[in-house]
Amino acid sequence: MFSKDTYIKRRKELKELVGSGVIIIFGNNESPCNFPNNGYAPFRQDSSFLYYFGQNRDGLVGVIDVDNDIETLIGDDIDIEDIVWYGSVDSVHDMAEQVGIQNTAPMKSLKTICNNAMSKKRKIHFLPPYRWDIKLQIFDLLGIHPNQQKEEASLTLIQAVVKMRSTKSAEEIEELERAAVIGYKMHTTAMRLTRPGLTEKYVAGQVDGIANSYGAMVSFPTIFTQHGEIMHGNPSMNILQEGRLALCDAGAETINNYCSDNTRTMPVSGKFTQRQLEIYSIVEACHDYTLEVAKPGVKYADVHFAVCRLMFDKLKELGLAKGDTEEAVRAGAHAMFLPHGLGHMMGMDVHDMENLDQINVGFDEEVRPNLEQFGTNCLRMGRRLQEGFVVTDEPGIYFIPALIDDWKAKGHCAEFLNFDKLETYKDFGGIRIEDDVLITKNGCRFIGKARIPYHPKDVEEFMGKE
């Protein structure tokens, strides 16, 4: 938790941006693994609740009466039975005091607060809910059916939250740096362990254990797979094989709920083959190009398409692609190899604030998403970069057998793709290199003081260490 003043200042700015009405920010509740008496999944508080109210306990709601400048933390104190099973926790009053809030109330009072506001036709601002228990709570409080809540959520509040959370403060950057330290240890552990004979799940389990051992948790389920062509492939009991590539996409989340998100691709044997090195070097060049051009004022969509053109040019040199590069990228031919965007916002969420709808987070009135074209419709971040933004830089090249077959059968982008050559890469897998990047005053820099090896020689050298 940050200082009391941090949360006071954040709520003050939020009130100024929203202007009037009643703001309700729901914290999360415990989520059972399958049924409540059989245990709960690790608790994760709603990020916007954490941002403005700081408390990492279930069953809390923050209410801000903007017009009357009244802030209230709503929740019930635990009873003796809960204390017996789970131990004592701070009272709601104490938690409110820790973040500079003067008023508290039990959960049953929230219905009265909402009824009073509605009777006076005051605007009630809430964010789009993503959990069913919160959707049902909103239905009970405001009478808005769950199917309508996304549309009824306050755009004014969404835009205010996005504006504030998009630009990271100095203390937030410090937390992201802490997450990066743990992320470094997670990824270098994976590199040291990767060798023929182990299972994907074994390596992934060791990676997860690093996060836990530092008092953190994983920022998303760890991806460790020899099938790197599957974007979000789960680790399996497959045994690591000589000659294959292993892709590790993993990150840590600190005790204050700030994340890291990195991806590395490594040769199981410890040495890249010539063919692997050719593709890897293209991804490496695209990754480094982003670092050269990303800076305040630049549209990240422009960086994405510049990377696509660079990638396509280099794939033409290998005989995998052909034709005019500009026309090919305009037609979406690059999505055969890169069917996702260059990156996304990152912070308290790995895909930061995407619960507020990507069109509100990664885009704006100037830069709009293309939802029609395959691949381009997965571009999560397109708007102009600003100092203090944190984005991921994650180009990749994937050889997806089903996609190759589909496009070949349809003749899709046939004037730009050499399908005969692509057939010979169906067993290749995929390569992705991902880092977290802070936009600075005049450019950008990596988050994290120690670089996870990613240049081919550095990867091979690191994997060769005992």
Cite the ranges covered by each PLM segment.
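Active-site neighborhoods and metal-handling regions in enzymes and metal-associated proteins
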Residues: 1-466
